[in-house]
Amino acid sequence: MELGPLSDIASEPGVTDIAVTCDGTVWADRGQGMRPHALRVPFSGPQAIRDFAVRLCSQLGRRLDDACPIADASTVEGVRVHAVIAPLVPQGAAISIRLPDVVAPSLESLAENGMFPSGWMPLLEGFVERRASVLVTGGTGAGKTTLLKAMLMRCAPGERVITVEEVRELGMLNHANHVSLVTRGANMEGKGAIGLSQLICATLRMRPDRIVVGECRGGEIVDLLRALNSGHRGGMTTLHANQVTAVPSRLVALGLLAELNPQAT
């Protein structure tokens, strides 16, 4: 993927996120929060930012224009691009890019970096080996997807892993028998959309050993629960929740979106 003026900062070790605001300011997160970054050749103006955003999305097969002013796109490797153009922003475009780890995360490296106590290692490994259903929760930027991917790396090589995502963030796993499914938006006529719920249902006919949903944010939680309760063990997903105590209410809220009785969750 060609990142143009952002190529240098994107290639720096430790950079996880890059953002471009509509005034042309570039921000980068090197693990300590967003900090401004000076480009060697800055954007010349709002139109240059917009043109750059359109080119980024076009590379990844997504439209970004007056008819479709918001775009989400990703590469097979897990680089994620989100862009919004004027008039939804004051001028130009607002661009957000999330970069995957250059080296696939491992549970050992995450423990060494302080994501969780080293004493949790046997517990997490046991979840994978016993094919337990796993729900990874946390706030924005907490590393939910990173931990999920590290756990998937512990799956037996022969397992058939089906991943379902709105935007491909997990990237390609080290499994020969891995299928990565992503949703599709509607076309100009408002037809052809394929959502998470449809994809989860499709996985049931794909002989999965594990069904993995990148993140549950809506009624698709019901389809995943049905899959896990129908004999498909070892499923995994993530859920946004700032505190563990908020998880039950979040699950109930998502279930209500699919008209599920609160007692069922």
Regions found by a protein language model. Give the residues of each.
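P-loop (Walker A) phosphate-binding loop of NTP-binding proteins
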Residues: 127, 139-140
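N-terminal anchoring/assembly modules that precede and organize ATP-driven motor systems
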Residues: 1-38
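Generic beta-strand/beta-sheet core signal
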Residues: 21, 29, 98, 137-139, ...
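Switch/coupling sub-region of P-loop NTPases
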Residues: 131-134, 150-265
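P-loop NTP-binding catalytic core
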Residues: 25-130
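Conserved lysine of the Walker
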Residues: 144
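Active-site phosphate-binding and catalytic loops of NTP-dependent enzymes
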Residues: 2-8, 56-73, 159, 258-264
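Hydrophobic positions on the alpha1 helix immediately C-terminal to the Walker A/P-loop
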Residues: 147
